[in-house]
Amino acid sequence: MAFDFKKEYKEFYMPKNKPEIVDVPKANYIAVRGKGNPNEEGGAYQQAISVLYAVAYTLKMSYKTDYKIEGFFEYVVPPLEGFWWQDNVEGVDYTNKSAFNWISVIRLPDFVSKENFDWAVETATKKKKLDCSSAEYLTIDEGMCVQIMHLGSFDDEPATVALMDAYLEQNGYVNDMNGKRLHHEIYISDARKVAPEKWKTVIRHPIKKA
């Protein structure tokens, strides 16, 4: 059986639909940074997703090539994730999608080194005829966070975030979103195949003691 991050790390990928506090360990990611409306057809966000998956699947299938990654084991490509923020806005203004800054990421297995990553970017660019130079090897250390499984459309997230904020207040914590610690979403559902009211999205916010 291929290693599945969602099953092996349920505490980070499959939380309940009520707020909980977690300490998220440091991990490495394929990342592409950008700005703009994620729903724009053929826009920067959709291009970034194409790059992420091109590199992710090149690494996943590397064992079928002459390139060998030390410590490799077969695995399921983890879910797409995103870090989101808007300049000069506290929290997230869901009505102004064109103002979004984002870092889209896919988690890497620990055995993927920077050297392996660089090989995958170069190989994906050649084989898929897609410029993958925007992809970067990014290490993220989230630390203490509050998270919840949001069910439904992205536009309905404010009500879920309000539950998270109330939970923090009751338990002596506050949000700690700043330039380095950001609103984080993990997309468990494939939005192309599942109705919006059934979308599952992990929402995670950095926190600190009040």
Task: Briefly describe each language-model feature range.
Residues 1-210:
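A solvent-exposed interaction/effector surface
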